[in-house]
């Protein structure tokens, strides 16, 4: 008997688990197929979650009802807030994961999720009828039927591991690769590219001389990614910092001809922002040293991840490199680093919902779309799961805008501009980063998560209470006047402020750079009554109000452009005045509105003006008809 589902998810990595959970939580009967049930949510590369921009994505996933934040909060070994000396727009949380515990916890969550069924199996082929996906067929001939399919295959598609002059078929960490499915996508007509990533060696902690390294402890206060987390892990493990040196660089230089990067063996394009150590040596040969972070892979293992030493050099050369690094001179290498090449689809073949333009009800998410990183994959998986379930159940799809979330920036960049290298999310990619902060992800997205059925009534009630407290406190401070008496003058001067000449509203005093919410309470002789996150919002929203309002005005302009819709079936070849490049790019991307069209590389303002005139003439023609 053939089994039938609403949604099938191929793969159970970081994109797959979020896709499967989101689909099931929206009420779709969902099947998740994975090559190995023991490797659900596996971390084949760095054992960490978060960091600049990426940490904000994890918060956004949580605000929309996803899982990554909750799981890392329960399984991390260290957590740090980054960029605390900078403005709120670039602050981000980063956690070191216990990679085994993370896997185990995520597997437990998936197994317990209602509507989500899990099966070990390798998908070889999509079942397609009239350009619409109808299900999948495995390598042993089993068929599963469904109304939608989400492909989240990571680096498994025609994966090949490269080490020195050796190259062999493999998924990450020497797992089985998926070869036939990649062939099937080519046969269906998808444009496929070849990308590359890599990983460093792991060493035995017992053989590291930590006295020659610099300790990197976690924060000594409770931190969490999830807005629902109330219990914090304070028993943390440190990371350690060391550096390469002239000796290390000589080993690389002497053996560069053995690197697959420079021998011509690697054909795929590697990640710009996570280069191998040999690539760093060649590209930045003026630098006398490069940072290396020694990151424990968990509480119950001695394996330490040497971040910054990603390499495809032969194993014996990797040992020689380690012997030159302070603290690692006698380190026992437990796993060698390697490079991995894999197939990815050109992401401009997708709609902003992550549904493919070529095959109806077929979605893709994660590294198959040309991205790098667990967080980028998880964000895409979440949206693909939300949209696939929404489409088949007729409960609505959702497209995040660039002003809604970093996830929106990520997906818009992929489907509008494409990428010729593994895409990494950066704060600099977001034009509204003051709006897309770590601290306000819930204020931006919880309403949306609730409307999509991803947020519980209890959580939504708590969120609304928080929002009301923020608004009420800002209003209260706007009604209180602080008088320039000796008490207030002394406190203000003590904190580096200038004396008051006249009375001032508490909210206006808080806008001064040297003032904080704590100081305002001191001036008012009041105790703390609100939660720290409410107080933080009051301070940030007050201090940055002018800048935030300017950003919101820019958002409104873009929204007006987004309201100018473009028909999906518009034939750009009939618009004679368009430049040839613009016509080709617009035909390829098929933008949904003028705002998206304006972001396509090769489409200039003159082309947009021509397109607007053409659309307006079309409307007038329809009215006259």
UniProtKB/Swiss-Prot annotation:
Listed GO MF terms: flavin adenine dinucleotide binding
UniProt feature coiled coil, ranges: none
A GO biological-process term: tRNA wobble uridine modification
Any Pfam family: GIDA_C_1st
Binding site for FAD: 11-16, 123, 178, 367
Alphabetical keyword list: Cytoplasm, FAD, Flavoprotein, NAD, tRNA processing
UniProt keyword Ribonucleoprotein, yes or no: no
Main location per the UniProt record: cytoplasm
Compartments in which it is found: Cytoplasm
Record-listed NAD(+) binding positions: 270-284
InterPro entries in alphabetical order: FAD/NAD-bd_sf, GIDA_C_N, MnmG, MnmG-rel, MnmG-rel_CS, MnmG_C, MnmG_C_subdom, MnmG_C_subdom_sf
Cofactor requirement: FAD
Keyword flag Lipid biosynthesis: no
GO cellular component: cytosol
Superkingdom per UniProt: Bacteria
Protein's job: NAD-binding protein involved in the addition of a carboxymethylaminomethyl (cmnm) group at the wobble position (U34) of certain tRNAs, forming tRNA-cmnm(5)s(2)U34.
HAMAP family per record: MnmG_GidA
Family classification: Belongs to the MnmG family.
Subunit structure: Homodimer. Heterotetramer of two MnmE and two MnmG subunits.
Name of the featured protein: tRNA uridine 5-carboxymethylaminomethyl modification enzyme MnmG
Gene field: mnmG
């Amino acid at each position: 008997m053939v089994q039938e589902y609403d949604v099938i998810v191929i793969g159970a990595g970081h994109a797959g688990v979020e896709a499967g959970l989101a689909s099931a939580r929206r009420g779709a009967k969902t099947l998740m197929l994975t090559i190995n049930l023991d490797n659900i949510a596996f971390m084949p590369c760095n054992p960490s979650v978060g960091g600049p921009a990426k940490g904000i994505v994890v918060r956004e996933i949580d605000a929309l009802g996803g899982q990554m934040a909750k799981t890392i909060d329960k399984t991390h070994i260290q957590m740090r807030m980054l960029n605390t000396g900078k403005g709120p727009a670039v602050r981000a949380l980063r956690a070191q994961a216990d990679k085994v515990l993370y896997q185990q916890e995520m597997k437990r969550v998936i197994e317990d999720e209602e509507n989500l069924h899990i099966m070990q199996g390798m998908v070889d082929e999509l079942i397609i009828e009239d350009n619409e996906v109808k299900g999948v067929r495995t390598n042993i001939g089993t068929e599963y039927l469904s109304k939608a399919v989400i492909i989240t295959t990571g680096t498994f598609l025609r994966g090949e591991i490269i080490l020195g002059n050796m190259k062999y078929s493999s998924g990450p960490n020497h797992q089985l690769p998926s070869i036939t499915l990649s062939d099937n996508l080519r046969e269906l007509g998808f444009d496929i590219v070849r990308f590359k990533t890599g990983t460093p060696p792991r060493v035995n902690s017992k053989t590291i001389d930590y006295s020659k390294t610099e300790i990197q402890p976690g924060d000594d206060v409770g931190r969490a990614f999830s807005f629902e987390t109330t219990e914090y892990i304070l028993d943390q493990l440190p990371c350690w910092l060391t550096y390469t040196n002239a000796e290390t660089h000589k080993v690389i230089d002497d053996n560069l001809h053995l690197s697959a990067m420079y021998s011509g063996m690697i054909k795929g394009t590697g990640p710009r922002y996570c280069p191998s150590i040999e690539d760093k040596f060649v590209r930045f040969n003026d630098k006398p040293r490069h940072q290396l972070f020694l990151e424990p892979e968990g509480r119950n293992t001695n394996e330490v991840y040497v971040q910054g030493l990603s390499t495809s050099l032969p194993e014996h050369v990797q040992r020689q490199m380690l012997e030159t690094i302070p603290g690692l001179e006698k380190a026992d290498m437990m796993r060698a680093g390697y490079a991995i090449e894999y197939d990815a689809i050109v992401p401009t073949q997708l709609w902003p919902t992550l549904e493919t333009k070529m095959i109806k009800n077929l979605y893709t998410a994660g590294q198959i779309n040309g991205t790098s990183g667990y967080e980028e994959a998880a964000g895409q998986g979440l949206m693909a799961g939300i949209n696939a379930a929404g489409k088949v159940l007729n409960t609505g799809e959702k497209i995040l805008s660039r002003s809604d979330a970093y996830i929106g920036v990520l997906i818009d960049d992929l489907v509008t501009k494409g990428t010729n290298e593994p895409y990494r999310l950066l704060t600099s990619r977001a034009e509204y980063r003051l709006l897309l902060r770590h601290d306000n992800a819930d204020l931006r997205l919880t309403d949306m998560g609730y409307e999509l059925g991803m947020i519980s009534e209890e959580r939504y009630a708590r969120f609304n209470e928080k929002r009301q407290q923020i608004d009420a406190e800002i209003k209260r401070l706007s009604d209180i006047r602080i008088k320039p008496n000796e008490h207030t003058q002394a406190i203000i001067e003590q904190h580096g402020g200038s004396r008051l000449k006249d009375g001032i509203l508490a909210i206006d005093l808080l806008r001064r750079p040297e003032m904080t919410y704590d100081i305002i309470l001191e001036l008012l002789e009041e105790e703390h009554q609100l939660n720290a996150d409410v107080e933080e919002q009051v301070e940030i929203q007050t201090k940055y109000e002018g800048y935030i309002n300017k950003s919101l005005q820019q958002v409104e302009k873009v929204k007006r452009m987004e309201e100018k819709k473009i028909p999906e079936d518009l034939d750009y070849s009939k618009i004679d005045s368009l430049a040839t490049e613009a016509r080709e790019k617009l035909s390829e991307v098929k933008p949904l509105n003028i705002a998206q069209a304006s972001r396509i590389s090769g489409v200039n303002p003159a082309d947009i003006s021509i397109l607007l005139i053409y659309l307006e003439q079309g409307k007038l023609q329809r009215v006259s008809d």
